[in-house]
Amino acid sequence: MATFKEMLKASMKSKDTEEWLDVYFTRPIGLVFTLLWKRLGVHPTVITILGMILGAAAGWMFWHSELEYNIWGVVLMMLSNFCDSTDGQLARLTGKKTLVGRVLDGFSADVTFFCVYFALSMRMMTELIPGTDVTWGPWIWVMAFMAGIMSHSPQCLLSDYYRQIHLFFLKGKEGSELDKSEEQWRIFREQPKKALFFRAFYYNYAKYCATQERRTKNFQLMMAEATNRYGAPLNLPAARSEERRVGKECV
């Protein structure tokens, strides 16, 4: 029977793509929940949806200025974060990894942070700008747009892509989720006209992949050159592949 430490390692994508806090705090606690959900036969997608609900509830708590509401908001946000950790760990331990689950996981995070940004903006509209006697008013929405849409969202998109690049060279195609937009567009076009859900799903995922590729032009050139020279990126000589894995010249 595997030890807790062995199961923790198996439940991670790779230790060097995990943040320090996740390795020593979030993931171990998440694994405890994972083992509970596994015993109860809960599917990872259910955990993802639960995390989204908890995140939205946290946003509602942050709408209020009272301390007790804010404390509950922090607690709910932490539980949402544990769910965000647990769904992936459960999927890797049980082999229930799906593209729908991956996309839903990202959507869950988007819903959570939208609710938090929206709630804090609504709350701060009537609060004073620090050091002045002027309220934030509609200007807080400008701040939220710059922080959430122009900064936070692109950062999440690229951090996910860089993580998948690293896993691609570390574990190969099977150990990563580095998808090409060209392939996703092909799958989208193959969906029946009446399959509205799947057409919408693959359309949005193809756009997501295309945005990642558009923002990493040097990496796309490197992948094309590796394919032309060696037949496939994973055929890179070991020394060059290691350089890519640790991040040299790849983006």
Pin down the residues of each PLM region:
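Alpha-helical transmembrane segments of multi-pass membrane proteins
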Residues: 77-83, 145-156
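Topogenic membrane-insertion module of multi-pass membrane proteins
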Residues: 1-72, 78, 82
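Helix-coil boundary and interhelical linker segments in multi-pass alpha-helical membrane proteins
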Residues: 59-72, 118-144
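Alpha-helical transmembrane segments of multipass membrane proteins
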Residues: 55-58, 113, 151, 155-156
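Hydrophobic, membrane-inserted alpha-helices
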Residues: 33, 53-59, 115-119, 245-248
